[in-house]
Amino acid sequence: MIFLGLDPGLGTTGWGAITVEGNRLSHIANGQIRTDPSMALARRLALLHDALAAVIASHQPEMAAVEEVLGNSNAQSTLKLGQARGIALFSLAEAGLSVGEYHPNVVKKAVVGTGSADKKQVQAMVSRLLPGVKLAGPDAADALAVAITHAHHHASARGYARRVRAS
């Protein structure tokens, strides 16, 4: 099964695709979509949508997940991040995918073992869980971590459903 993870941002959106067979994870591809800050906001959002649509068409994921947005003290930045996240959610929904959403601390805990992990720890564990992966950057590593988290949660939910049906 192919999982796509997204770490949305207006300046840089990370994406990562993995395949899961049983309990084995394999890297398919990862990348970062960048938009030019000198462009109009609407144009940047349109470019983000087009790039995400191309990633989805290219890798044909069956499951997808997006990292939730954390607010910060700059309301304008938080709003723009929310708009980029909306484009990510829309792009996945447009492709007919159901979408998991995870708080960054949940992703860190699932991949590193602690919700307070830093970016370098996340990158190191993603590299360990997906041997041979060449990370396109920190946002791509975060996106792969989101995909891994969703794969774990999906496997747990499937196992639970099987146990409930068997009882």
Curated annotation (Swiss-Prot):
The gene is ruvC. GO terms for molecular function: crossover junction DNA endonuclease activity; DNA binding; magnesium ion binding. Mg(2+) 2 binds at E67. Coiled coil: none annotated. GO terms for biological process: DNA recombination; DNA repair. Homodimer which binds Holliday junction (HJ) DNA. The HJ becomes 2-fold symmetrical on binding to RuvC with unstacked arms; it has a different conformation from HJ DNA in complex with RuvA. In the full resolvosome a probable DNA-RuvA(4)-RuvB(12)-RuvC(2) complex forms which resolves the HJ. The RuvA-RuvB-RuvC complex processes Holliday junction (HJ) DNA during genetic recombination and DNA repair. Endonuclease that resolves HJ intermediates. Cleaves cruciform DNA by making single-stranded nicks across the HJ at symmetrical positions within the homologous arms, yielding a 5'-phosphate and a 3'-hydroxyl group; requires a central core of homology in the junction. The consensus cleavage sequence is 5'-(A/T)TT(C/G)-3'. Cleavage occurs on the 3'-side of the TT dinucleotide at the point of strand exchange. It catalyses: Endonucleolytic cleavage at a junction such as a reciprocal single-stranded crossover between two homologous DNA duplexes (Holliday junction). The lineage of its organism: Bacteria, Pseudomonadati, Pseudomonadota, Alphaproteobacteria, Sphingomonadales. It is found in: Cytoplasm. The active site is at D7, E67, D139. It is an enzyme of class 3 (hydrolase). Mg(2+) 1 binds at D7, D139. It comes from Zymomonas mobilis subsp. mobilis (strain ATCC 31821 / ZM4 / CP4). This is Crossover junction endodeoxyribonuclease RuvC. Belongs to the RuvC family. PANTHER family: CROSSOVER JUNCTION ENDODEOXYRIBONUCLEASE RUVC. Binds 2 Mg(2+) ion per subunit.
